[in-house]
Amino acid sequence: VEFVDIAGLIEGASKGEGLGNKFLSNIREVDAILEVVRVFEDKDIIHVANKVDPLQDISVINLELILADLETVSKRISNLQKDVKRGDKVAIAENAVLEKVEKTLSDSHLASETVLDEKESEIIKSMHLLSMKPILYALNSSEVAENVIEKVTKEIPGSYVLIDAIFEKGFEDLIKKSYELLGLETYFTTGEDETRAWTIKKGSTAPIAGTAIHTDFKDKFIRAEVVFWKDLLDAGSYAEARNKGLVRTE
């Protein structure tokens, strides 16, 4: 997982305030959004709004994503109308999905909250909407009272993780949550010289998982020898697991 620091978001970013347009175009290139939100008080560290209010910060960020998406969707709907009027089936289908998403955005909700079936989701995918991306909230909570954290986490609008950037705590949880958010998992290869970790999409078959090592694995895959990890540990070695009949071919 690669984390990209995108700075410059302020209220009005969707209208070009601050680094608005640059910020928003950078977000379009990522697979998910990690919103790092300040929870701790420190008079020596200035807050852009001159007060620490994590829920308000989240609201501001999400609203800017929503407004940017609303403009994108509205423009697309407008551009489709000529094709819709002449009965183009593809345009009609896309227009219907866009109108559903537009309604969600107009109600100040993230596009991801729109109820879409698989076909509709595929249609909207090409729009690369900002608020359709999965979001994880990282609460930077150095030395914050527990009751403050509890209040914030009760109202936070999605998955979150607690971190402490000063003392570098919670980063392992952050990585785990990021993997979950993106639907990723890790498998390991091991040999005499090294053990390596490979990142794949959850549920990948062996041939697809093998492409993380080399693309040839997909096209030239024949079979896999499988053994449960606990059986392998109990046996003490792969050779012994094979001798005990614990290895099967799939």
Predicted regions and their residues:
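Switch II of P-loop NTPase G domains
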Residues: 1-35, 39-55, 59, 115-127
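C-terminal-of-GTPase-core extension/linker across diverse P-loop GTPases
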Residues: 79-250
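Conserved nucleotide-binding/hydrolysis micro-motifs of P-loop NTPases
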Residues: 8-10, 38-44, 51-53, 66-67, ...
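Buried, small/hydrophobic-residue-enriched core segments of structured protein domains
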Residues: 49-65, 101, 110
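Short, compositionally biased low-complexity segments
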Residues: 37-44, 67-79, 154-159
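Residue-level signature of catalytic and energy-coupling elements of molecular machines
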Residues: 5, 23, 34, 73, ...
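ATP/adenylate-binding site constellation spanning eukaryotic-like Ser/Thr protein kinases
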Residues: 3-6, 70, 132, 203
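Amphipathic alpha-helical coiled-coil segments
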Residues: 30, 61, 66-69, 73, ...
